[in-house]
Regions:
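A generic secondary-structure micro-motif detector
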Residues: 27, 52-54, 84
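A non-catalytic, amphipathic alpha-helix used as a structural packing/dimerization or gating element
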Residues: 28-43
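Generic non-transmembrane alpha-helical segments
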Residues: 39-47, 66, 70, 97
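Internal helix-loop-helix
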Residues: 69-110
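Intrinsic disorder at enzyme termini
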Residues: 1-29
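Short Gly/charged-rich anion-binding patches and loops
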Residues: 36, 62-63, 93
Length: 110
């Protein structure tokens, strides 16, 4: 069972060195989700980057729906709420990657 952080707890909670999440220690699930997110970025976001500057809200809505269908929006949501239940670290990994091309997606993603 995953130990979920509550709210902004990660900002003030004391962290042990062995609990720090580094790329060299990604599990297979994290690698798979990262690869899926990178594919999503290249296939769906990169080709339409210039449209973000035009404030195309329908585009952002469409992309967020597609991200949701892939499970990218529910990575760290517990399974009992129909998320993937992969935990905080995996959620942050996906957030970092999906936000890497444009701040608009970073803002929409949360």
């Amino acid at each position: 069972m995953m130990n979920y952080l509550k709210g902004g707890e990660f900002l003030i909670k004391e962290t042990q060195a062995q609990d720090i999440f580094i790329r060299e220690e990604f599990g297979e699930d994290q690698k798979m989700m990262l690869e899926s997110t990178q594919d999503f970025n290249e296939r769906e976001i990169r080709p339409v980057l210039t449209r973000f500057e035009e404030k195309d809200y329908a585009l952002v809505e469409s992309l967020m729906r597609k991200a949701g269908e892939l499970g990218l929006l529910g990575v760290n949501v517990p399974e009992k709420y129909e998320g993937l239940g992969m935990g905080f670290n995996t959620g942050m990994l996906i957030c970092e990657e999906i936000s890497s091309l444009t701040g608009s997606i970073a803002t929409a993603f949360g």
